[in-house]
Amino acid sequence: MMLSNLLILPMLLPFLCALILVFLKNNDRISKYLYLGTMTITTIISLMLLIYVQRHRPITLDFGGWSAPFGIQFLGDSLSLIMVTTASFVITLIMAYGFGRGEHKANRYHLPSFILFLSVGVIGSFLTSDLFNLYVMFEIMLLASFVLITLGQSVEQLRAAIIYVVLNIIGSWLFLLGIGLLYKTVGTLNFSHIAMRLNDMGDNRTVTMISLIFLVAFSAKAALVLFMWLPKAYAVLNTELAALFAALMTKVGAYALIRFFTLLFDQHNDLIHPLLATMAAITMVIGAIGVIAYKDIKKIAAYQVIISIGFIILGLGTNTFAGINGAIFYLVNDIVVKTLLFFIIGSLVYITGYRQYQYLNGLAKKEPLFGVAFIIMIFAIGGVPPFSGFPGKVLIFQGALQNGNYIGLALMIITSLIAMYSLFRILFYMYFGDKDGEEVNFKKIPLYRKRILSILVVVVIAIGIAAPVVLNVTSDATELNTSDQLYQKLVNPHLKGED
């Protein structure tokens, strides 16, 4: 019972900290230590819960003494807790990275509070086992992210915010419509209860329509085909906010797609999974076009996010254990790698004052850390062993082969090479670039930011080396979410499909 109560802490601690920070906007030092300490503790608690779940069984927390399906339930299983742990870790580093960026101005806008409110929505989305509360968490994320995009009040930010909000509101409307139709059909909102009742119903046209509604809603959140909001939104954000959005916002949508189309709507595999694979292929191609079409390194980074979403959903679309396992592994890896990517890109813009790669003017010779970090990051994105992207991509390849999706497999290989090429092009100018012989006065990057970059580089290498440990977690997550009977037995054994 006591252990179950700990499940609320990864969401509760950032929420309480965000409220306290509102009243500490004039005290930078206390604010910094408070939010960094809060997210560090949140990461440690999440990791402890993950270790327990791996050694024993999933944890559930029923609020108010009301057991599922009637009450609100949080679920700590391998999938939710590895996502919470990874998200908490990168949020901690992102907030530490922004430590020295005009704190007085940031606190005047309550920037740390809104980052923490966004964290509440992200972590709550991973932990909830209830459909309506997932919607609530998505709306918390949407509200906080809208405020973060518009901070600074420039024309570019407001334009990007309008596109971002309109598309995400449409996604939210579809999500709410799907919830209403699903509740009318099955009479419950709890994940495990929904899974049981949908299995009892078998193939059903109404359920098929509902599953398609959820597919579109989550695709808008994940930037799966419906990516129009992403490049403009990410391009106007400062470094830490761009890293935050790239690491987490699309990943919550991808997580929802994985949870829904393995656990809930698995009886519609013949329709949904080929559609997912097709959408993934389109997304990869669009992302690949984007990374070679621009010289703006922030936009190149944004399209790298789109390509990676295509990789993840291709794994899900294979509808094989290997493919789904690879999708989850790559999802976790991509949170860390995209944080590193946007930290590096943001640092390059800060040092040179330019966003076009041809102005990098041999920067890596003067700042060798960025050259080394960039090379490691490229290999991780490309799936080169022994770096962190390799195990996930191998499993997705394996799943595509088992599924017979040779077109998706070929596109993944081609777009991976294009993604690496676009980054090697930046790297070339970092080492050898010379824009018309001009001298660029490089700014000095603060030492603490170099240390944070170094931490992320070490983690990227460690994930690749310790891949068997991570794969144990992702394999358990895959097994639980692809087996309705196992999920019911371990999560809500008291529920019956006909109740």
Curated annotation (Swiss-Prot):
GO terms for biological process: ATP synthesis coupled electron transport. Keywords: Antiport, Cell membrane, Ion transport, Membrane, Transmembrane, Transmembrane helix, Transport. One of its GO terms (cellular component) is plasma membrane. GO terms for molecular function: antiporter activity; NADH dehydrogenase (ubiquinone) activity. It is found in: Cell membrane. The chain crosses the membrane at residues 3-23, 33-53, 79-99, 109-129, 131-151, 162-182, 210-230, 241-261, 272-292, 309-329, 331-351, 370-390, 404-424, 452-472. The keyword Transmembrane helix applies. It is a multi-pass membrane protein. Its main location: membrane. It holds the Pfam family Proton_antipo_M. May form a heterooligomeric complex that consists of seven subunits: mnhA2, mnhB2, mnhC2, mnhD2, mnhE2, mnhF2 and mnhG2. Expression of the mnh2 operon in E.coli is not able to catalyze Na(+)Li(+)/H(+) antiport. It does however confer higher growth rates than the control strain at up to pH 9.5. The operon may encode an NADH-ubiquinone oxidoreductase. PANTHER family: NA(+)_H(+) ANTIPORTER SUBUNIT D1, NADH DEHYDROGENASE. Belongs to the CPA3 antiporters (TC 2.A.63) subunit D family. This is Putative antiporter subunit mnhD2. It comes from Staphylococcus aureus. The gene is mnhD2.
